[in-house]
Amino acid sequence: MVSGEFASMKSLHGMVPHLTPMPIAWGTYDSDPNIHFFLCAFVDMTEDIPDPQALGKGLAELHMKGHSPNGKYGFSVPTLQGTIPQYTEWSDSWEEFFTNSIKKVFEAELKSQGSDPEILALEEAIITKVIPRLLRPLETGGRKIEPRLIHGDIWDGNVSTNIATNFPVIFDATCIYAHNECKSPFIKICAIDS
């Protein structure tokens, strides 16, 4: 699903071009339909993580500018965290979006590991008790969260420093419009177990 990475990087580049390589194209090899490519502008980078203050400032700028185009949570195309599909369907509330994302993690766990009564009980508790208690108050009583574009997979392997500018660079994105402090940790849970 290279199209998801291309759309993610295009969205990021539209908001913070100084923080991302410019995406150019994506496609599938004519000679082998199982091989795909993503092409972006070359950025000569260090092997070190960027200055935390500069990276934080760049991500804050992204979250300030990255308004959802339809006011909803989700993303316009499917994206992947490695080989794991990320939930991207449009949702009206953060609670709804996050709940559906967690359900997808549990579905993947069930498919991968089979049925387990403890996991099923944990899923029930998280879906019916934990998420509503933690997230519902963020969007009730006059409070509102505006969905913001997030990278979706920020870690030290997806950030670097541009040698020419000394500015941070972010890449390998799996974007969603989400709570601006979300880092898609629910996908990481599934990825660790796979």
Feature annotation, model-predicted:
Residues 1-96, 100:
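ATP-binding pocket architecture of kinase catalytic cores
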Residues 21, 37, 147-149, 168:
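Hydrophobic "anchor" residues on beta-strands that sit immediately upstream
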Residues 28-32, 67-151, 162-165:
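An alpha-helical support segment within catalytic cores of ATP-dependent transferases
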Residues 29, 45, 168, 174-176:
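Activation segment
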Residues 53-55, 165-166, 183-186:
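Short, glycine/charged-enriched secondary-structure capping and boundary segments
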Residues 108, 175-194:
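Active-site activation/catalytic loop segments of kinase-like enzymes and analogous catalytic loops
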Residues 154:
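Hydrophobic HxD+1 residue recognition
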Residues 157-159:
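Hydrophobic residue at the +6 position relative to the catalytic HRD Asp in the kinase catalytic loop
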